[in-house]
A protein has these predicted regions:
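Helix-terminus/linker motif at the lipid-water interface of multi-pass membrane proteins
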Residues: 109-128, 197-206, 262-273, 332, ...
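Transmembrane helical elements of multi-pass membrane transporters/channels
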Residues: 96-115, 218, 285-289, 293, ...
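Cysteine-centered motifs
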Residues: 22, 30-33, 42
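Generic alpha-helical transmembrane segments of integral inner-membrane proteins
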Residues: 102, 106, 110, 114, ...
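N-terminal transmembrane alpha-helices
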Residues: 85-117, 121-122, 138-150, 182-186, ...
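Small-residue-rich hydrophobic transmembrane alpha-helices
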Residues: 127-187, 226-245, 359-423, 454-477
Length: 510
């Protein structure tokens, strides 16, 4: 017995036990020693339980040694020496921007998911039709979002230099130009809608094509409202006000669910409009959001961006327009190439059957939810970089972008790996079709596998755009899109017969 106590004393004299964090382990050791003292001295050496206890005790010692080694490695990193400054950066600059953007994007995507639920109850043909039409709508929304990005950067730079007038003029002119462009675009798409759907849908069934055309013709009417909402929200974010866009877009999407639900399925004795109600509800909701954005800007809720309604009829200042477009056009080319490549891959998928089309659509919806924190951090990096460079703090902009990048990479990888085992459960919220669910599960696991490289292709380019360097990201996007997403996706998915998995492998190569 004395020999065992002395052995325990020698172990406890190890310097590792001097760390305050080891107090819980020391209490465990004391409990073991008390149990040893209470045992029969003669039978102690022959008791199997005593050897089992010492085996666990040695395991505890090994774990503590590993913990000590890890602690020394962490203490030797550059991150540990600057952890206080990173903590201040996270809570004072990243969080106030990223959290409202995250909540806003979450509202948008969750409402999109709920909209998908509403349509999915009409059948998988209806869901496939919405997916095909939305794959084209996303190209247009990507273009509007890119001009919105240019407005955000110019507003952030202008306010960083204390030039409120330039920020207001940039916002006003972006709203005017993009509204007029959206009206023209909606007219053209409405006229050529049938040809567009034939091009996008490929070998889809006639019923799916008819539903996709109906949805497209209804949603193009909302393009002017979508442009106003996106650009107005981007200007407010550039001014550092991320809560107002959150409230407006969150309310807008809740209204979309309520209005669409009533229009699709009816209310009381009214039977509703069926599938037509989905597109009509989205259009009405977007116009309500556009009116709310114009009202917020008119009353000067953010004093830096007070824009009266009559000011929209003033002459345009083309020097500011070209500054916005100098960022927005390369960014829009990148976004349009990205969504166009996605549209082409959708065409690859369109010939693989209705179940694969629906599963691909659902998997993209779930992946977008998983990627929400990274999208929010990417938007925050654009604003933070623009602000810092606006006041000439180049080194600080680099440090902050690097921090946001690693935060996004580690966070998204953890989320993707933790949610992948529940892919089947998430798919069940959308559909009960076993074939569709099988497709979704495979694609979500693939998404988790390649998540560690996502931030390098999303957050870093967002930071470059905040530095008014959108051209480099545009060229990289152009080469990778057509060289990888389209070519590799076609070779693997169509030529080699990998199906939708091959198409997604092309996306990961991109």
């Amino acid at each position: 017995m004395l020999r065992h106590i002395l052995t325990a004393k020698n172990i406890l004299s190890n310097p590792i036990f001097k760390f305050p964090n080891c107090l819980p382990f020391l209490s465990t050791v004391c409990c073991i020693c008390r149990q040893f003292v209470g045992e029969n001295l003669c039978s102690f050496a022959d008791s199997p339980s005593s050897f089992e206890m010492w085996f666990h005790f040695l395991q505890l010692r090994s774990a503590l040694n590993i913990s000590s080694a890890l602690r020394q490695v962490v203490h030797g990193t550059r991150w540990h020496s600057k952890r206080k400054s990173y903590k201040v950066l996270f809570w004072r600059e990243i969080t106030p921007l990223a959290v409202p953007i995250f909540m806003e994007n979450a509202c948008v995507l969750l409402m999109g998911v709920l909209s998908t639920f509403l349509v999915s109850w009409l059948g998988k043909d209806a869901m496939a039709g919405v997916g095909l039409a939305d794959s084209f709508n996303m190209v247009i929304m990507a273009f509007f979002a890119a001009i919105d990005l240019g407005t955000t950067v110019v507003v952030a730079f202008s306010l960083g230099k204390r030039d409120r007038r330039r920020a207001r003029v940039a916002t006003r002119q972006s709203l005017v130009i993009m509204t007029l462009f959206a009206v023209l675009l909606a007219t053209l798409i409405h006229h050529f809608g049938e040809q567009i759907i034939d091009f996008v849908a490929g070998d889809a069934t006639t019923e799916v094509k008819a539903l996709a055309l109906t949805y497209l013709e209804l949603t193009v009417l909302s393009y002017p409202a979508a442009a106003i909402t996106l650009i107005g929200s981007g200007a407010l974010r550039g001014a550092g006000n991320t809560k107002i866009p959150l409230l407006i877009n969150g309310s807008l999407n809740i209204l979309n669910i309520i209005i669409s639900g009533i229009l699709i399925y009816g209310l009381f004795s009214w039977p509703g409009l069926g599938f037509v109600g989905a597109g009509l509800g989205l259009t009405i909701s977007r116009y309500i959001g556009a009116v709310a954005i114009l009202w917020v800007l008119a009353i000067g809720f953010n004093p830096a961006l007070r824009i009266s309604l009559k000011s929209y009829f003033k002459p345009l200042n083309f020097s500011i327009i070209w500054e916005v477009m100098g960022i927005g056009i390369p960014a829009s080319v990148e976004s349009v190439l990205f969504t166009s490549g996605r549209l082409l891959t959708q065409m690859f998928v369109a010939g693989m059957g209705t179940s694969v089309i629906a599963g691909n659509f659902i998997a993209f919806s779930i992946a977008a939810l998983i990627n929400l924190p990274g999208s929010a951090l990417g938007s925050a990096s654009t604003i933070i970089t623009g602000r810092r460079l606006g006041v000439g703090q180049i080194a600080q902009a680099e440090i902050q972008l690097r921090h946001v990048f690693w935060l996004s990479t580690l966070g998204l990888t953890a989320i993707a790996w933790l949610t992948a085992p529940f892919a089947g459960v998430m798919a069940s919220f959308y559909t009960q079709d076993p074939q569709v669910k099988h497709v979704v599960v495979i694609l979500i696991w693939l998404n988790a596998l390649f998540m560690p490289i996502w931030s390098a292709s999303w957050v870093l380019p967002a930071g470059f755009k905040g530095a008014r360097d959108a051209r480099y990201a545009m060229w990289v996007s152009m080469l990778s899109m057509w060289g990888c997403r389209v070519v590799v996706g076609y070779v693997l998915g169509i030529m080699l017969g990998w199906g939708v998995v091959g198409v997604w492998m092309g996306m990961f190569a991109d």
